UniProtKB/Swiss-Prot annotation:
A single BP term in Gene Ontology: translation
UniProt entry tagged with the keyword Transcription: no
Signal peptide limits: none
Lineage: Bacteria, Bacillati, Bacillota, Bacilli, Bacillales
Quaternary structure (record): Part of the 50S ribosomal subunit; part of the 5S rRNA/L5/L18/L25 subcomplex. Contacts the 5S rRNA and the P site tRNA. Forms a bridge to the 30S subunit in the 70S ribosome.
Name of the protein in its database record: Large ribosomal subunit protein uL5
InterPro entries xrefs: Ribosomal_uL5, Ribosomal_uL5_bac-type, Ribosomal_uL5_C, Ribosomal_uL5_CS, Ribosomal_uL5_dom_sf, Ribosomal_uL5_N
NCBIfam families: PRK00010.1 (NF000585)
PANTHER family: 60S RIBOSOMAL PROTEIN L11-RELATED
Species for this entry: Macrococcus caseolyticus (strain JCSC5402) (Macrococcoides caseolyticum)
Length: 179
């Protein structure tokens, strides 16, 4: 069992039960999944760009990414329906906890001028979205092999009903929110 999963079961769950006065242990919110998405607009002109992005995403998450395709054709972007334009990974279970642990304790502190992440990125239903500007903050990415810096979106889906519960859950897990 991963370190964060143990922490969740032994420390966070009782703390949340006390704070929000849940009647059942099943009411305590938990992280359901983490979706890491990389939109690669350059893939329209050059399909090799997509391959390197997929490799990087696989190195970061430890899971093979799914290539996302365009839903609509957009003439101004020279984009046709069905063209590959991105990659995404949905993490659940052990891999999810390992990725979250690495994100909070290793990657986010490596961001330049890091003062904590925004409190305002909750969606109203207890999910948190985080944008990362460059993939170099992850320890698996070799600086010399990177052809282009790419950003990614990280969505943390929780079972929390409100943003307040979700914020408390992520804070307990060690997410560095701005004060």
């Amino acid at each position: 069992m991963t370190r964060l999963k143990e922490k969740f079961l032994n420390e966070i769950t009782p703390e949340m039960m006390k704070k929000f006065e849940y009647s059942s242990i099943m009411e305590v919110p938990k992280i359901e999944k983490i979706v890491v998405n990389m939109g690669i607009g350059d893939a329209v002109q050059n399909s090799k760009v997509l391959d390197s992005a997929v490799e990087e995403l696989q190195a970061i998450t430890g899971q093979k990414p799914m290539v996302t395709k365009a839903k609509k054709s957009i003439a101004t972007f020279r984009l046709r329906e069905g063209m590959p334009i991105g990659a995404k990974v949905t993490l659940r279970g052990e891999r999810m906890y390992e990725f979250f642990d690495k994100l909070v304790n290793v990657s986010l502190p490596r961001v330049r001028d890091f003062r904590g992440i925004s409190n305002k990125a909750f969606d109203g239903r207890g999910n948190y979205t985080l944008g990362v500007k460059e993939q170099l903050i992850f320890p698996e990415i070799d600086y010399d092999k990177v052809s282009k810096t790419r950003g990614m979106d990280i969505v943390i889906v929780t079972t929390a009903n409100t943003d307040e519960e979700a914020r408390e859950l992520l804070t307990q897990f060690g997410m560095p929110f701005q004060k």
